[in-house]
Curated annotation (Swiss-Prot):
Tree of life domain: Bacteria
GO biological process, one term: DNA transposition
Any GO MF annotation of the entry: DNA binding
Record protein name field: Insertion element IS1 5 protein InsB
Organism: Escherichia coli (strain K12)
Keyword Ion transport appears in the UniProt entry: no
Record InterPro entries: Transposase_27, Transposase_27_IS1
Function text: Absolutely required for transposition of IS1.
Sequence intervals crossing the membrane: none
Pfam families noted in UniProt: DDE_Tnp_IS1 (PF03400)
Amino acid sequence: MPGNSPHYGRWPQHDFTSLKKLRPQSVTSRIQPGSDVIVCAEMDEQWGYVGAKSRQRWLFYAYDSLRKTVVAHVFGERTMATLGRLMSLLSPFDVVIWMTDGWPLYESRLKGKLHVISKRYTQRIERHNLNLRQHLARLGRKSLSFSKSVELHDKVIGHYLNIKHYQ
């Protein structure tokens, strides 16, 4: 009976305290810095939004194409500062070759390192972007499921990366 439901006529209230307690790590523990070498690291950024599409939130991350795992990730605006935060997380790792798309900030940040700019060599991370969009509805471009706060957006996606790649 519709009248017997405790939520009849109003939306149920959700308790997000368990999500707010999440403390996802930003770097993998599967690869030991200094002892393991990352031969090919693909880097890319993925667009998302919080509340409205005008409030963009970017996920920058590096993907080890041989181990098929995410090495590190950061959230922020699509700027050199966010890319710098990702690079500082990756600095303890011995990366031989960096592979990126044609975004100009990658070229300026990776000057002096072995850097390949090609769509052909970033297809694994681009496929991983698609997998993230398929698994996490809040990353979909046209979806009714979107994040309402920056904190929960970062924690939910970070927790997913922890479960699938960092443990």
